């Protein structure tokens, strides 16, 4: 190894994002990455974007104060039973404040109701499952009740799509 008197050039190479990406896709990914200025803005504590008092999940509050790099390293864990119970109690407390107590207790026993936090937009299109629809079902034999027989076909025909001769939907 002989010392070389000529000055050496240092070559800096930018590692490719992913070897299987074409250069155009790599450029699009690079453009979408946040700049340091936007990272500072999003991690700013004085930012009024999120009201932490309105967030019921204490784990979410702690992740908001983390930097994006710390949030990326953190793996998602399922909530413990205690955390889940506090979230449910918080949700039910909000429901009781907005609705009358009778409606909230009836909706919790219904198996067809939507999960908490999701508005039930399809209730108008579904057949009525309370009172009137269940009275005729009581007179039917128990085998039909166990199979979950729907009300008469007259009620459902308005909600069914027309089918062609092969059974495919025309719409």
Swiss-Prot record:
Assigned keywords, A-Z: Acetylation, Carbohydrate metabolism, Glycogen metabolism, Phosphoprotein, Protein phosphatase inhibitor
Residue numbers carrying N-acetylmethionine: 1
One biological process term in Gene Ontology: intracellular signal transduction
Pfam families named in the record: DARPP-32
Region ranges (Disordered): 17-171
Keyword Membrane: no
GO CC terms, sorted: cytoplasm; extracellular space
GO molecular function, one term: protein phosphatase inhibitor activity
Disulfide bonds: none
Record-linked InterPro entries: PPP1R1A/B/C (IPR008466)
PTM (free text): Phosphorylation of Thr-35 is required for activity.
Region entry Essential for activity, spans: 9-12, 42-54
Modified residues annotated as Phosphoserine in this record: 43, 46-47, 67
Subunit and partners: Interacts with PPP1R15A.
Family: Belongs to the protein phosphatase inhibitor 1 family.
Annotated protein name in UniProt: Protein phosphatase 1 regulatory subunit 1A
Lineage: Eukaryota, Metazoa, Chordata, Craniata, Vertebrata
